[in-house]
Amino acid sequence: MKSIKRIGLCISLLILIIFATSCGSNKITGDSKEEQIKKSFAKSLDKYPTENLEEFYDKEGYRDGEFEKDDKGTWLIRSEMKIQLKGENLESRGAVIEINRNTRTAKGNYIVREVVEDSDGMTHNHTKRYPVKMENNKMIPLKSIDDEKVKKEIEEFKFFVQYGNFKELENYKEDEVSYNPEVPIYSAQYQLKNSDYNVEQLRKRYNIPTQKAPKLLLKGSGNLKGSSVGYKNIEFTFVENKEENIYFTDSVYFNPSEDK
């Protein structure tokens, strides 16, 4: 009888130990995953700022099996401001450029887009692309442009990676950090103030028709340690509702080159 009681006691203790260890380990794993997400973003954001885009010719990105051995890779950089006021169409202006490390050339487009909704509620994209190249850290149109406003915008355009700065990221107070391992996708959201450096820089360069301070949303997919097929996007959302939308998006990718 005593032996049975001892066995029963041992089993009970073992169950308690397993339960306690399991609960503790889930908490540690959760905290660890949150830190991994922050570190993953911090690693990609350390490229901000890179004032001279030509430095990307010599910058190495994350490489995996998608790259051929002799492919140095291509950086894809995109920045875009989108504004939709109440009762108006969504308008966006921005640029995308591919910096090929093999050929040491950079080409892309300055893009002006308007999303129009017709009487049937169908949306239509009216998009104009102006081919550009980069020389001496400046965007130069590859074709003549009659629109003086667009011509000036291209001359003055800077990608966010050229002036954005995330050195204070660790001091930001996050609203939410999420992770879905099945996809996998992950994100971190922060409420910013208008006094934040990046917000001031955006207001300096764009006519942002609201005084609301934005939320910063960092979105990523793929392996947290890095992936050439995943993405990491930055979004500053000033206004987001059914009638109005004001937000800025930015991304810097490192991909296998198409010329390989």
Curated annotation (Swiss-Prot):
Lipid linkage positions (S-diacylglycerol cysteine): C23
Main localization of the protein described in the UniProt heading: membrane
Gene Ontology cellular component list: plasma membrane
Keyword S-adenosyl-L-methionine applies: no
Domain of life of the source: Bacteria
Subcellular locations according to the entry: Cell membrane
One Pfam family named in its UniProt record: DUF576
PROSITE patterns membership: PROKAR_LIPOPROTEIN
Keywords (A to Z) from UniProt: Cell membrane, Lipoprotein, Membrane, Palmitate, Signal
Membrane-topology annotation of the record: Lipid-anchor
Lipid-binding residues (covalent, N-palmitoyl cysteine): C23
Signal peptide residues on this chain, from the entry's feature table: 1-22
Entries under InterPro entries matching the protein: Csa, Csa_sf
Gene3D superfamilies in alphabetical order: 2.50.20.40
Residue ranges crossing the lipid bilayer per the database entry: none
UniProt family annotation: Belongs to the staphylococcal tandem lipoprotein family.
UniProt-recorded name of the protein: Uncharacterized lipoprotein SA0404
